[in-house]
Amino acid sequence: MVRAVTEKNQERALELYYDLLTLKEPPMRILFLLAKQYRQLLQVKQFGAAGLAQTEMASKLGVPTFAVRNIVSCARAYSISELEQAVRDFVDAEESVKTGRLEDKLSVELLIIKYSSKKAAG
């Protein structure tokens, strides 16, 4: 599902999200996984701008080099500023749920819709 979001495949992302909910996956866990992926996308984008090789990126992120290749591929669809905004949005969503401003399922669904949209997020 995370990959469907980062690849901007909204229909698939929502379908998989609803499947996860049916399987009783907690929405906050899904939010955590999405936030983690977007943080990695941002870090890889920043590392690339700094001229780091993918092997160095893998070492800094603590993931295998093949995983970095996948992250780099997904990161191409975003600018650094879009990824920074996404990370802020995920933090804000978590805060909204924890303070009771938004229900957890809705909060995650809204983020999936926003970031899997083909038009520019933000």
Stretch-by-stretch model annotation:
Residues 31-34, 87-90, 112:
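Short alpha-helical scaffolding segments that buttress acidic/His motifs in well-ordered protein cores
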Residues 25, 94, 109:
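Acidic-residue sensor for enzyme active/binding pockets
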Residues 60, 74, 89, 111, ...:
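Residues that form generic nucleotide/phosphate-binding pockets
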Residues 71-102:
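C-terminal capping/gating helix-and-loop segments adjacent to ligand/active sites or protein-protein/ligand interfaces
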Residues 1-82, 119-120:
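Small-residue-rich helix-loop
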Residues 101-122:
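Short, charged, intrinsically disordered terminal tails
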Residues 4, 47-49, 87-88, 102-106:
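Short coil/turn segments at secondary-structure boundaries
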